[in-house]
UniProtKB/Swiss-Prot annotation:
Disulfide bonds: none annotated. The gene is aroQ. The keyword Amino-acid biosynthesis applies. This is 3-dehydroquinate dehydratase. Belongs to the type-II 3-dehydroquinase family. Homododecamer. Catalyzes a trans-dehydration via an enolate intermediate.
Length: 149
């Protein structure tokens, strides 16, 4: 693994409201707190971490496109786009960067429309229902994959 390894963390719509929005489902941690924890974890491993949260699908797609040749791994919480976005799926397939899908809540224990993901069958792995800690597990897995190269 080179010291230049980079991981991109993408968060979809309404994740900017963490700590306020439905804490019973999503917890009390804010997005900046989660990103700070991940940044420290990545720095300890000698990995550069980038983060983007957007409520706009096209901004997430553009970030995925820009990652091609610049990022070694993606961790994505597509949020509501999980269940609707063929475009995000196509972008991830187009750049062929390995990715892990993360969800704070257990989407399979919620409304039926949340049970389908357009990304899960293409992800290296899916972590759901573990709250903010799910991001840490995803980052640990990504780092392990990069270190194994």
């Amino acid at each position: 693994m080179s010291a230049k390894s980079r991981i991109l963390v993408l968060n979809g719509p309404n994740i900017n409201l963490l700590g306020l929005r439905e804490p019973g489902h999503y917890g009390h941690q804010t997005l900046p707190q989660i990103v700070d924890t991940l940044t420290q974890q990545a720095q300890t491993a000698g990995i550069e971490l980038e983060h983007l949260q957007s409520n706009r699908e096209y901004e997430l797609i553009e970030a995925i496109h820009a990652a091609h040749g610049n990022v070694d791994f993606i961790i994505i919480n597509p949020a509501a786009f999980t269940h609707t976005s063929v475009a995000l799926r196509d972008a991830l397939l187009g750049v062929a960067i390995p990715f892990i899908e993360v969800h704070l809540s257990n989407v399979h224990a919620r409304e039926p429309f949340r049970h389908h993901s357009y990304l899960s069958d293409k992800a290296l792995g899916v972590i759901c229902g573990l709250g903010a800690q799910g991001y840490e597990f995803a980052l640990s897995a990504a780092i392990a994959r990069l270190q194994a190269k």
